[in-house]
Structures are given as C-alpha cells and as structure tokens.
Regions:
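Mid/C-terminal beta-alpha module of Rossmann-like enzyme folds, strongest
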Residues: 74-155
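A short glycine-rich, His/Asp/Glu-containing loop-to-beta-strand
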Residues: 146-172
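Substrate-positioning beta->alpha
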Residues: 28-36, 53-74, 106-110
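Conserved catalytic-site region of short-chain dehydrogenase/reductase
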Residues: 22-26
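A conserved pocket-lining segment of Rossmann-fold NAD(P)-dependent short-chain dehydrogenase/reductase
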Residues: 16-21, 39-59, 79, 88-98
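Phosphate/oxyanion-binding loops and surfaces in catalytic or ligand/nucleic-acid-binding neighborhoods
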Residues: 40-47, 70-78, 111-119, 166-169
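Active-site Tyr-X1-5-Lys
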Residues: 1-16, 32-43
C-alpha cells in the first residue's frame, strides 16, 4: 500500500509484482526444488519427492527478464489477485508476467529422468518453443557435468555407407 500511496501522491509510476516460484540456475539444496532436482539427477545424487502430485506455478528466469523489459517499454500486463490466483485486468493495480507453467513435482522428475536417459535411449521428449520441457532441459544442462555431455554413438555401416542416429523424438 505504501508504494500505491506514493504513486497517488507524486504521480510516479509504480509497478508491484507478486511472482510465483522462480525457476533458473541457482544453488541446489538451498531454496529451489527444481534446481535441486536438476542437480541431483544430473549428478546421480539421491533426492526425495514427498508428494508427486504437489503442483507448482513456475516462472522461468528468462521470462521474468522479458517481463521486466516489457515494463521498461510500458507493455507490462496488469492484474488483481483473488487469493493467489491472478485475474487479468487492464486497469489492475498489480503487474504480472503471464508466462508461467503449472506442473507437478512428479512431472518435473519424470522429465528430468527422460533427459538423463537420452544418451542411452536417444529419445528426446517433445520440447516446443516456450514449453516448460524446453526450459527445464535448458536448466538441467547447466547442472550436467561436462564429462556427461559426450557419449558413444553407434554407427550402422553396410555397403551403402554409414548412418549414425543422434536423437529420436516421440513422434518419429
């Protein structure tokens, strides 16, 4: 309320955000379950998920930065809140970044396990642009030790030549 009062009294522009859980590279085993899971899976460390059905609303750090650029260009999104739910409202007092992802802990861990198995199965989950999977994969790679970036590929050779499969997708 102090900021809103200040804006009212001075005419200054004030932008108040209430962010959901942020997701980006951070110290594992500190304050981010997602970073901890990424680090643990990438480094073969044990971890515990108490309830796979627990849902998180996550905002990826790159999307947060994009939202801040929108604010600087006067393109921010406004809202009000109904409890913790964001209600889009053009003349709302609050601002928000609309690119969030609601996912369960189980979905996060399952995706991370698929990423970990990719060098063995060559199977890559669907990762459309802007998807949670693509953002999680980008984060996972930041925790992957450099020696795990390379792996042996099988070359198929016959009288026609050679062929090496690098990756499979679920659709092909």
């Amino acid at each position: 309320e102090l900021f809103f009062d200040y804006a009212q009294e001075t005419g200054a522009k004030v932008a108040v955000y209430r962010f959901p859980n942020l997701m980006g590279h951070s110290r594992p085993k500190y304050n981010s379950a997602v970073s901890t899971f990424c680090w643990a899976v990438a480094n073969d460390e044990p971890f515990t998920v108490n309830d796979r059905s627990t849902e998180l609303e996550l905002l990826y750090i790159d999307d947060l930065v994009e939202g801040m650029f929108d604010l600087l260009e006067n393109k921010e999104k406004h809202c009000e809140f109904d409890g913790v739910e964001t209600v889009l409202k053009e003349d709302g007092r609050y601002c928000f970044v609309p690119l969030t992802h609601k996912v369960t802990l189980g979905e996060i861990v399952d995706l991370l396990q698929k990423f970990k198995q990719q060098p063995i199965t060559l199977m890559m989950p669907k990762m459309p642009d802007g998807s949670f999977a693509k953002k999680l994969y980008s984060l996972y790679l930041t925790y992957l030790p450099t020696d795990k970036f390379k792996y042996t590929l099988k070359m198929n050779v016959d009288n026609r030549g050679s062929f090496t499969e690098l990756v499979h997708t679920e659709d092909c």
